Amino acid sequence: MEPIIIPIEDVIDLHTFKPKEVPDLLEDYFQACVEAGIYYVRVIHGKGQGILKKRVWHILQKNDLVIAFRDAPSEAGGWGATLVALNQKV
């Protein structure tokens, strides 16, 4: 499988990725963000039935680069997106 190239910005939309790609994708994305000096990001997982959100939050709880996360405010996606603070001292 070819590596997926994604631009490193403060927002990532997971709609275009397969669920099985999400854990490795987020790990690589967070690492790239820290290396680029981006410490606050928004992960868009969508609202739907909340299955992907639960998976994302599970991943965030276990990731050493993540220091905090919460639902985005309504103007930034509400419960269809998660705001993530990354560790600046890695």
Predicted features and spans:
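Long, charged, low-complexity intrinsically disordered regions
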Residues: 1-90
